[in-house]
Amino acid sequence: MVYLTLQKSQKVFAASRHLHKVAAKALEKSTPEETVTGSFASFIHNVRPDHLSDLVRHRSKRMILDSIGVGLVGSMTHVFDIALRYCQEIYSSSSSSPVSSVYGRRGLKLSPPLAAFVNGVAVHSMDFDDTWHPATHPSGAILPALLAASQMVPAASRPKGLDFLLAFNVGIEVQGRLMRFSSEAHNIPKRFHPPSVVGTMGSAAATAKLLSLNATQCGHALAIAASLAGAPMANAATLAKPLHIGNATRLGLEAALLAARGMEANLLILDDTPGCAGFNAFYDDYQPSPLTLSTNSHEFLLEKQDIAFKSFPAHLGMHWVVEAALSARNLLIDHSGSLSPSAIHTIILRVPLSKYINRPFPESEHEARHSFQFNACTALLDGKMSICSFSPDSLCRQELSQLLSKVMVEHPKDNVANFDKMYAEVTLILQNGDILTGRCDSFYGHWRKPLSRESLLRKFQTNASRVLPKDNIDNLVKTVDNLETLPDCSLLASCL
């Protein structure tokens, strides 16, 4: 038995030695900076605040403010309570220092990884967080990690607000670059939830930058994060989906902390190495390229591709169908002089084909947030959408059930499941045979029709006011607006 075990160990060692030789040969052909992974690590380590343009600073601060507001209102949800109780009860005897703030719980502190986890859950608890193209939720996977990490650094050496803003943009940039290595990633996902993959990598990159890891440690942080990434789309529209963001931000933070303590991993993790599955394990058409940084300037992806902010808490695709439904509703009122659901014979939705957001009769708030049918019919019935639209009382209305029973869904070939190209049409066929159609190509809040400063502030203030007094809300707005001048970035987390 001992002999057989020794034989197995020798085989494992030989196989491991072979893999190390393959990796070594690949590295021999180029310096670390010339590999894709090495270029990313070098970028994370070397990028400076003066590489941030005024536009990138402006857009990223809007993202930070919106994400904080979404996290604060998310701290009132059932799924957040479950996650918080879990961390408090299961890890109550943890030796980790409880130094990091929690959304909506003034005075409560958790260890940095646990604070990042519960705050990430809060951000995605209602699917109210921002969305980018290619499709992912970029801010929620990064901001909680940075807030938690900022409070764990000794007071005498804490990064400044400008360092925090740079680290945030590093995390956004890494996510965007990775998703652009695959055309598959541009469309509404089918297999795995993107922020659970690229968000984990972005969190690791952002935390590594904030904590000033060296280039090699940055590479190891990315490689470690890749081993902690992934979540299946089958858990969309369930209580488990917010865990995807919570885990992404926590595990990315932990990957950076492990790298800082000497943990090593494959420094070719982002390269397309023949015979070795690295980050290409997540995308069938993965074609990476180096992330270069010039001495004087760098064009961040956020400069070219703005973000989408949601006006109500639901999957981004719902925002097209709601605006189309509201347009059809107005046509019906103009046509008939009033809104009478009984006057509607059939409702036709022309939307992209995506199974997990095609839910004819949702039975929970999380299913409702991922239902074209529910959102279209609720908008027709109420003339608006809000947090209250997904309450149990709203879901159980008789008149809503009657409208849902009249819905037919069509998937035009030209309507692709892509947040940059999709559209929505809502056609009402009336009992008298008249036909009314509302259409939306770009909803208000989409990157082609960005929210105004006033609309973004109104959303933030409405969300934050559920848990914070007005003075605290005003202070948060000022702190984010003046983030570059903040002498200690942990002051932002202390405002929560």
Question: Which residue ranges define each predicted feature?
Answer:
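Short amphipathic alpha-helical face segments that pack within enzyme cores
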Residues: 140-148, 198, 202-206, 319-324, ...
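Hydrophobic face of alpha-helices
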Residues: 57, 61, 65, 142, ...
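Function-dense linear segments that define catalytic or interfacial modules
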Residues: 114-166, 170-174, 178
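Generic alpha-helix initiation/capping and coil-helix boundary signal
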Residues: 7-8, 16, 53, 160, ...
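Glycine-rich, mobile lid/loop segments that gate access to catalytic sites or pores
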Residues: 151-254, 273
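Terminal-appendage/accessory-domain detector
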Residues: 2-6, 13-136, 233, 240-250, ...
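Well-ordered alpha-helical scaffold segments within catalytic/enzyme domains
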Residues: 74, 146-155, 204-210, 255-258, ...
